[in-house]
A protein has these predicted regions:
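Transmembrane alpha-helical segments of polytopic membrane transport and secretion proteins
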Residues: 1-32, 258-275
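Periplasmic/extracellular loop-to-transmembrane helix junction in inner-membrane transport proteins
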Residues: 44-92
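Alpha-helical membrane-protein architecture signal
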Residues: 59, 73, 77, 81, ...
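Transmembrane-helix boundary motif in ABC transporter permease subunits
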Residues: 89-119
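Generic hydrophobic transmembrane alpha-helix motif, especially the helices
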Residues: 120-156, 163-164
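Glycine-rich helix-loop "coupling/hinge" segments at transmembrane-helix boundaries
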Residues: 136, 164-165, 212-249, 268-275
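Transmembrane alpha-helices
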Residues: 147, 151, 183-216, 240, ...
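Short cytoplasmic-facing helical segments at TM-TM junctions of multi-pass membrane proteins
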Residues: 160-205, 226
Length: 275
């Protein structure tokens, strides 16, 4: 009888497993430790609350600015909507223009010879270095902000599309042509699927660069946006609003990255498999 009970207990232990992976568990543990240290430093007043308010104060302020009271004549959701609108418009423009440009560069040495020097000349320059030019040429309105974000996203997207085309195995292209496929069919059914993993990776990189550029671009003559909210709060020494805004910026960037990763896994399930 005791043997049966021990076997059942042993099998029960074997069936139960920690639901989270080791990496996720370590990440959550790290965040918990950081929050605990932050709370302890604030509770012991090792740093003035003016410079480092406690986590509960930041959370309370976040809930306040998310409500009707808002901050700087707009709620948190209105600031967030303004930022997301800018990044989405710039990302769509980079996708519509950057991917075809990268594919054309990968397929045509002539096109690559014309466009590659231009992209390689402007790509190493930090996007914010172009901000004064954008303001001079396009004013301080929305166009300059969206165009600056587009400039930041375009190069990673175009160069990733180029790398994706170059990574397609030539034997597959020759096999498709030998079976009578037209150029359009080879492009659509062979080259694009083969280049898609690199293209999506470029989108992830470009979105990260574009999001950081967006926050900086909103410091210039903006009336709404997460960057504007953080900058305005800093001018009034509202550290709790600054930290709340930084937390929202980080969370949105993390969610966008997770979304693109999920899209990449769905569209390219074969990526990473041994060919």
């Amino acid at each position: 009888m005791s043997v049966l009970i021990n076997e059942k207990l042993h099998s029960h232990r074997l069936k139960w497993r920690w639901p989270l992976s080791r990496q996720v568990t370590l990440s959550i543990g790290t965040l918990a430790v950081l929050l605990t240290v932050w709370w302890a430093v604030a509770a012991l007043q090792l740093i003035s609350p003016l410079f480092l308010p406690p986590p509960q104060q930041v959370l309370a302020k976040l809930l306040t600015i998310a409500g009707p009271q808002g901050f700087m004549d707009a709620t948190l959701w209105q600031h967030l909507a303004a930022s997301l609108t800018r990044i989405v418009l710039a990302l769509l423009a980079a996708v519509v223009i950057g991917i075809p440009v990268g594919i054309a560069m990968g397929l045509s040495p002539t096109v690559r010879g014309i466009l590659d020097p231009i992209i390689e000349l402007y790509r190493p320059v930090p996007p914010l270095a172009y901000l004064p030019l954008m303001v001079i040429w396009f004013g301080i309105g929305e166009n300059s902000k969206i165009l600056l974000i587009y400039v930041a996203i375009f190069a990673p997207v175009a160069m990733s599309a180029l790398a994706g085309v170059k990574s397609v195995q030539q034997v597959r292209i020759r096999a498709a042509r030998s079976l009578g496929a037209s150029r359009a069919q080879v492009l659509w059914f062979v080259i694009l699927p083969g280049a898609l993993p690199e293209i999506l990776t470029g989108l992830r990189i470009g979105l990260g660069v574009g999001w950081s550029t967006l926050v900086a671009a909103e410091l210039i003559a903006a009336t709404r946006g997460l960057g504007f909210m953080v900058q305005s709060a800093g001018e009034f020494l509202a550290t709790d609003v600054v930290l709340a805004g930084i937390a929202v910026i980080a969370i949105i960037a993390f969610l966008l990255e997770l979304g693109l990763r999920a899209l990449q896994r769905r569209l390219t399930p074969w990526h990473g498999e041994v060919q």
